[in-house]
Amino acid sequence: MTRHDSTRVIRAATGTTLTAKSWLTEAPLRMLMNNLDPDVAERPQELVVYGGIGRAARDWESFDAIVAALTRLDDDQTLLVQSGKPVGVFRTHADAPRVLIANSNLVPRWATWDHFNELDKKGLAMYGQMTAGSWIYIGAQGIVQGTYETFVEMGRQHYGGSLAGKWLFTGGLGGMGGAQPLAAVMAGASCLAVECRRSSIDMRLRTGYLDTWTDSLDEALRLIEESCTAKRPLSVGLLGNVADVLDELLLRGIKPDLLTDQTSAHDPVNGYLPQGWSVEEWDAKRVSAPKDVEAAAREAMANHIRAMLTFHALGVPTVDYGNNLRQMALEEGIDNAFDFPGFVPAYIRPLFCRGIGPFRWVALSGDPEDIAKTDAKVKELIPDDAHLHRWLDMAAEKIAFQGLPARICWVGLGDRHRLGLAFNAMVRSGELKAPVVIGRDHLDSGSVASPNRETEAMADGSDAVSDWPLLNALLNTASGATWVSLHHGGGVGMGFSQHAGMVIVCDGSEAADKRIERVLWNDPATGVMRHADAGYAIAVECAKDQGLDLPGILS
């Protein structure tokens, strides 16, 4: 089993020449490779895409076997992938998914990091995160809009609708956390983001998600103060340990205007630097003494949360951004760790109630002009949404593509299928140079059960009910998605989430029209269904307006 190979450099093919037998198999092949593009993945030589150890394939032998299987797969066959390893090819039918993926799933009693890590060492499992192992990661752009929407809503709720002259403090500049500085600037705020790895800071600078960096807290605070005084948003990366920096801010009596965190705290061995440790010591001991690392990291997380709670008590709007940091602190004896809310119940849930979530698409041509044309089509089909248009304009101006050109755009039930059909027609007419794939994050309205994140504080107490993502995966399979995935542990770690993903190919065919219409209606509809079942009036109203047939939910 080879997990590290510094000689491998993977990039997705572009253009219209196929390696596989059709676009339905070429698409997952290119997206798998795109996940490991050096401009996309955090540690591609280790197959790590983002989020601690979120991988695209179990090992390099499995990667090669997946590529070989996709290359020979027929359009009436389905490839099964078990925790990053291809395990079977079966005859199905043309409208069935070409790939079905299950990653990191464990029987609940054994769904712990200790048990998973033992399996991982033996080469029997792979942590797929959300979009790493489901081959639809698009770089930090993937969560930029969701983060932007969160920060904008924080501005509405706490600062009268404007973040001008305000600043956000956060930690983590990895594949997910790296979206925060750009999202803050787009929302009108400055951002001070602490990151312990210089390589992560460099990647965010290179891809345009971060404006500048320093290894001096004094310099970072000077830059933030100047930007806030001038009301010119600026993002500053600070090389350091976030728990240490928060303690120092408290000692100095300096309060940010907004506070959150997106370190990889969900994984206490691989995702969080203990206080007082160098990165080199951490990297070495993650292999030689993982239990020592975990204990030290958990202690640091408890200190981190103590500081956040202090700022919260001082009136600073403080929010958990879904990395399970509060849970880790709770387990370390911080009984009030959940005194500040998660971002979904605080700011995002009304969108989920209408099936609105992180819709994304990727141009398999590799040509940025295809994304420009689809951006214009979104504006044409949704003409009256000024907020959406403003987002698309900002995205076109400020977001650098990583790997294949892509766009994230939060839209919901009633719009997703219209956009998909329009994109397919553009492929058919030749307006787009090659097919487009449409997918989403697993963080969506109907595709996840995560009591410390997406389903925190549900109105009916159904936070931990995971039937919903299972039903979502089954329905997307039945509807004809091109590939469907079912994962465990994404975002918040082992034992704390189950979630499903889907991707569908717009290859320009009439057969694709039918699949697109089914999938891109049914997928967001499950989110409306889930929230209507929990008793949210917005979701009930949406379900009725859209004519959903929900026996047992709608009277």
From Swiss-Prot:
Under InterPro entries, the record lists:
Urocanase, Urocanase-like, Urocanase_C, Urocanase_central_sf, Urocanase_CS, Urocanase_N, Urocanase_Rossmann-like, Urocanase_sf
- Where NAD(+) binds, per the record, is at 51-52, 129, 175-177, 195, 262-266, 272-273, 321, 491
This enzyme's EC code(s): 4.2.1.49
Does the entry feature the keyword Lyase, yes or no? yes
MF terms from GO for this chain are: urocanate hydratase activity
Q: Name one GO cellular component term.
A: cytoplasm
Presence of keyword Coiled coil: no
EC class name: lyase
The UniProt catalytic activity note for this protein reads: 4-imidazolone-5-propanoate = trans-urocanate + H2O
Q: Which cofactor does it need?
A: NAD(+)
- The record lists its disulfide bonds as none
Q: Which residues form the active site?
A: C409
**Location(s) in or outside the cell:** Cytoplasm
Q: Tell me, in one coarse class, where this protein mainly resides.
A: cytoplasm
User: Which terms are listed as keywords in the entry?
Assistant: Cytoplasm, Histidine metabolism, Lyase, NAD
- Identify the pathway: Amino-acid degradation; L-histidine degradation into L-glutamate; N-formimidoyl-L-glutamate from L-histidine: step 2/3
Role description = Catalyzes the conversion of urocanate to 4-imidazolone-5-propionate.
Q: Which family does it belong to?
A: Belongs to the urocanase family.
User: Which PANTHER family would you find in this protein's record?
Assistant: UROCANATE HYDRATASE
Q: What is this protein called?
A: Urocanate hydratase
Look up and give the organism this protein is from: Xanthomonas campestris pv. campestris (strain ATCC 33913 / DSM 3586 / NCPPB 528 / LMG 568 / P 25)
